Amino acid sequence: MPELPEVETTKTSLAPLLGQKVTNVQVFQPKLRWSIPDNLADLVDYTLDSVERRAKYLILNFIPLADDGISSTVQPRNLQPRQLLVHLGMSGSLQQHNHASDKRKHDHLIMSFIGADSTQTQLHYYDPRRFGSILWLEEYGDKLLNHLGPEPLSDAFTADYLYHLIQRSRQSIQTQNSKSIKKQPIKRAIKSVIMEQQAVVGVGNIYATESLYLSGIHPATPANEVSYAQIVILVAHIKTILQKAIKLGGSTLRDFTVADGQTGYFQQTLNVYGRQGNACPHCESTLENIKLNGRASVYCPLCQPIISM
């Protein structure tokens, strides 16, 4: 699944399309995780103004052309800016072609652009497993974005934030008489917590696995048993790992590419993810694998011991 570094890299790779006008929108398979809106062709004659990322979502901001053909948010025709919310799902990617390109089997949408110099470009949404989504932000933004936690590379994601979240903010538990409610520390596995989008966004399996390894924390350690000092180290490694992954273009484990067709290289630096049965890079112990919430979690039994309080 494309995770935060892959989505961030995709955002950056869309820069050549900024300022270009949409000339055509073709939807070949609308049935993704949620159906593609049937009025996406309304974007024809709009200009792609900017691209943002929130968690693993891309937000494509389009502005309409004024009557004089100049992009503007002030429209005599009462046209308003539009925003697309794009999620790449398990296997999706946005791929840019600088010429008319034949539709491939898993191309579900092709958006055509023209630049000020008459250069024509196509943007293909490619998704073999069809778990992604392309939606209007104004219709689905509240539902999909409002519950999200802080960005891991922002100042809001700190050791203090994560530690207090774990210690004080477990789901409320009702007593048998349903009258009183008490809160307890989070006892779920620390890996599960840092992968929850409500806690912090975008820390997927690859980057959670690598961060926990570098922090010396067993992935199954109950979150409330992780010390504050360990949380400080973990948060620092999450930030460092994600920054490094973005710099290397993310991870290409199957067929992920960004819009310009480039693949990521972070997978070449992996210490433990996907390496069960191999030697630990640090101590040469055999790396082991457990399942947490249905996901593989590779770790070193010597470098990442379970410590019971």
From Swiss-Prot:
Source domain of life: Bacteria
GO MF annotation list: 8-oxo-7,8-dihydroguanine DNA N-glycosylase activity; class I DNA-(apurinic or apyrimidinic site) endonuclease activity; damaged DNA binding; zinc ion binding
Mapped zinc finger ranges (FPG-type): 271-305
Assigned EC number: 3.2.2.23, 4.2.99.18
GN (gene name): mutM
Binding site for DNA: H106, R129
Gene Ontology biological-process entries: base-excision repair
Active site: P2 (schiff-base intermediate with dna), E3 (proton donor), K56 (proton donor), R295 (proton donor)
Protein name: Formamidopyrimidine-DNA glycosylase
Co-factor: note: Binds 1 zinc ion per subunit.
Function, as annotated: Involved in base excision repair of DNA damaged by oxidation or by mutagenic agents. Acts as a DNA glycosylase that recognizes and removes damaged bases. Has a preference for oxidized purines, such as 7,8-dihydro-8-oxoguanine (8-oxoG). Has AP (apurinic/apyrimidinic) lyase activity and introduces nicks in the DNA strand. Cleaves the DNA backbone by beta-delta elimination to generate a single-strand break at the site of the removed base with both 3'- and 5'-phosphates.
Organism of derivation: Psychrobacter arcticus (strain DSM 17307 / VKM B-2377 / 273-4)
Family membership noted in the UniProt record: Belongs to the FPG family.
